[in-house]
Amino acid sequence: MNQEVIAKRYASALFQIALEQGQLDRIEEDVRAVRQALAENGEFLSLLSYPKLSLDQKKALIREAFAGVSTPVQNTLLLLLERHRFGLVPELAGTVSRPRSTTARGIAKAVAYSGAASTDEELRALSDVFAQKVGKQTLEIENIIDPELIGGVNVRIGNRIYDGSVSGQLERIRRQLIG
């Protein structure tokens, strides 16, 4: 089975535990810390794959090295070790990430295309209006300037586009007059 698929399964399970226990921020932070610690200390991974160390010794090393992380993260690390999949930790850490947690918190990403730069107040107003439309608590809006827009704003949320541009309104009027 593909390593990425396996890592996603473990990440998904860890994410569900984080949601159930209300520890999403803590577990996200812990997973990032584990990832960084392993990236900075490559010898640790080599030590865990050393055949002369028993499984209990390796578990003790993990418990000692990651004593400060939450129990679900520590248990996931131990489970990966038992199943000879500890090498998946960096990939697992990449999958327990912002997109999934922002969705769980009711945050969606959006892009607002406008003819000129929008103010923070305008972006906040757009966020409030469109968050309700898509059933989210808030939107993280990125403003992209499109010089072809005469006026108004086009907002893209996921694969949906809301056309509030002047040219879009003129096109709708033209269609009504013709049809």
Curated annotation (Swiss-Prot):
InterPro entries: ATP_synth_OSCP/delta_N_sf (IPR026015), ATPase_OSCP/d_CS (IPR020781), ATPase_OSCP/dsu (IPR000711). It is a peripheral membrane protein. Gene3D superfamilies: N-terminal domain of the delta subunit of the F1F0-ATP synthase. The keyword Zinc-finger does not apply. SUPFAM superfamilies: N-terminal domain of the delta subunit of the F1F0-ATP synthase. Coiled coil: none annotated. It holds the Pfam family OSCP. It comes from the Bacteria. It is found in: Cell membrane. One of its GO terms (cellular component) is proton-transporting ATP synthase complex. GO terms for molecular function: proton-transporting ATP synthase activity, rotational mechanism. Keywords: ATP synthesis, Cell membrane, CF(1), Hydrogen ion transport, Ion transport, Membrane, Transport. F-type ATPases have 2 components, F(1) - the catalytic core - and F(0) - the membrane proton channel. F(1) has five subunits: alpha(3), beta(3), gamma(1), delta(1), epsilon(1). F(0) has three main subunits: a(1), b(2) and c(10-14). The alpha and beta chains form an alternating ring which encloses part of the gamma chain. F(1) is attached to F(0) by a central stalk formed by the gamma and epsilon chains, while a peripheral stalk is formed by the delta and b chains. Belongs to the ATPase delta chain family. F(1)F(0) ATP synthase produces ATP from ADP in the presence of a proton or sodium gradient. F-type ATPases consist of two structural domains, F(1) containing the extramembraneous catalytic core and F(0) containing the membrane proton channel, linked together by a central stalk and a peripheral stalk. During catalysis, ATP synthesis in the catalytic domain of F(1) is coupled via a rotary mechanism of the central stalk subunits to proton translocation. This protein is part of the stalk that links CF(0) to CF(1). It either transmits conformational changes from CF(0) to CF(1) or is implicated in proton conduction. This is ATP synthase subunit delta.
